[in-house]
Amino acid sequence: MSRQLSRTDNLIHQFDTILRTLVPHAATASRANPAAGTQDKAMSDAERRHAAGLMRINHTGEVCAQALYQGQGLTAKLHETRDQMEQAAAEEIDHLAWCDERLRELDSRTSYLNPAFYAASFGMGALAGKLGDNISLGFVAATEEQVGRHLDDHMHKLPMGDRRSRAVLEQMRTDEAHHERWALEAGGARFPAPLKLGMRLMSKVMTKSVYTL
């Protein structure tokens, strides 16, 4: 059972999470990098730039996921599922660190737009939390489903020689599927198709802009 945190403890924790999420190279993974021991094959400069664009999108997706969990943490009750929510958020920090590390290996960087997407996702998470735990958990499930779609698409689009990025994305895909399943089993509402379509359209704005910026 988690220790009950004071208001000051919560503020410190929130600020620390913001820093680890938005400051480049600040996130530290609690698990080993899935790409450890995996070697890339030869890639052209164009392939490396393409791989970096995809990994930048994935990194920003994890920034959004972390903001979602943090926003919900401020407003949702989640008495029965807070431990699982905190575990999922910790795994998203792992994903942030792995994507950041891979971007550096590809001689690239994280997106300049991360603060804006963080703020938007934080607000949506806080609003979802206010609407009740079933909506909050349903939003987690729908978001993780969307992230999973991106990961599947990116694993298909990665250059054949980029084995290290693929290893990272495969582990992330496993984690995201687990988060989605947990949120639904915990009572999350299944969002209707029109709402999911709206989320996909918003996601396209992110992917188009972050690929280069």
UniProtKB/Swiss-Prot annotation:
One term of GO molecular function: 3-demethoxyubiquinol 3-hydroxylase activity
UniProt cross-references to NCBIfam families, sorted A to Z: DMQ_monoox_COQ7
One Pfam entry name: COQ7
Keywords assigned by UniProt, alphabetized: Cell membrane, Iron, Membrane, Metal-binding, Monooxygenase, Oxidoreductase, Ubiquinone biosynthesis
Record text on cofactor binding: Binds 2 iron ions per subunit.
UniProt record similarity statement: Belongs to the COQ7 family.
Residues reported in the UniProt entry to bind Fe cation 1: 62, 92, 95, 176
Protein name (record): 3-demethoxyubiquinol 3-hydroxylase
Class in the EC hierarchy, top level: oxidoreductase
Native source species: Chromohalobacter salexigens (strain ATCC BAA-138 / DSM 3043 / CIP 106854 / NCIMB 13768 / 1H11)
Taxonomic path: Bacteria, Pseudomonadati, Pseudomonadota, Gammaproteobacteria, Oceanospirillales
Pathways involved: Cofactor biosynthesis; ubiquinone biosynthesis
Protein's membrane topology: Peripheral membrane protein
Function noted in UniProt: Catalyzes the hydroxylation of 2-nonaprenyl-3-methyl-6-methoxy-1,4-benzoquinol during ubiquinone biosynthesis.
Keyword Membrane: yes
Cofactor section: Fe cation
Major subcellular location class: membrane
Reactions catalysed, as given in the entry: a 5-methoxy-2-methyl-3-(all-trans-polyprenyl)benzene-1,4-diol + AH2 + O2 = a 3-demethylubiquinol + A + H2O
CC per GO annotation: plasma membrane
Binding site for Fe cation 2: 92, 144, 176, 179
